[in-house]
From Swiss-Prot:
Matching InterPro entries: MobA-like_NTP_Trfase (IPR025877), Molybde_CF_guanTrfase (IPR013482), Nucleotide-diphossugar_trans (IPR029044)
Annotated function: Transfers a GMP moiety from GTP to Mo-molybdopterin (Mo-MPT) cofactor (Moco or molybdenum cofactor) to form Mo-molybdopterin guanine dinucleotide (Mo-MGD) cofactor.
Gene it is expressed from: mobA
CDD domains recorded: MobA
Enzyme class: transferase
Needed co-factor(s): Mg(2+)
Protein name: Probable molybdenum cofactor guanylyltransferase
Gene3D superfamilies: Spore Coat Polysaccharide Biosynthesis Protein SpsA, Chain A
Domain comment (free text): The N-terminal domain determines nucleotide recognition and specific binding, while the C-terminal domain determines the specific binding to the target protein.
Localization per record: Cytoplasm
Amino acid sequence: MSRWAGIVLAGGMSSRFGEPKALASWQGSTFIEHILKEMTSALQEVVVISHSDIKERVEQFVQVPVIEDIPHYKGNGPLAGIVSGMEYIEADWYAIMPCDAPNVSHEWFTILLEQTSNEYDAVVPIINGRKQPLFAAYHNRVKEKIYALLQEEKRSMGQLLSQCNVKYVAGEDVQANTDWFINVNTKEEYVQAQKDLSNE
């Protein structure tokens, strides 16, 4: 059993972005390729959770397994994706990543996993005053809590965190760069992120 594993939530077509964000171009590759490069350098095993409408396209770009949500919970948002990844890879801890944060660094996963300890169910960063539950780490034991929530048709990450013993970590306390957590949700944000990158 791996001690640590990674789960990338690739989703599917994005209505706000106009195309699958996972496959958006970034620094000569794609969002998903960049994220996986950073994750796989820090974690033993990584799996991508993808919507069926883009699964085959994602598989062409990556060298890790690409799976869909467990059929019974398909389309139930991030909780369904996380629990599907937990079922696919057996590990103690899982680092989660959305597919729309292409600035992330392998350093983040090292920092995150250094913060884990058995007394906690989750380690969640607070960046610029906001909780970031999709850039977090979750212990294997959280799986049963997620199933219970999905059975009750509860889908929010906040509902999961309210049931967990969470260690909240302020980004500035662990030398985390706030740029690592920038989400790209629209084409305007995409253009801005590319400009910011070229100005560095």
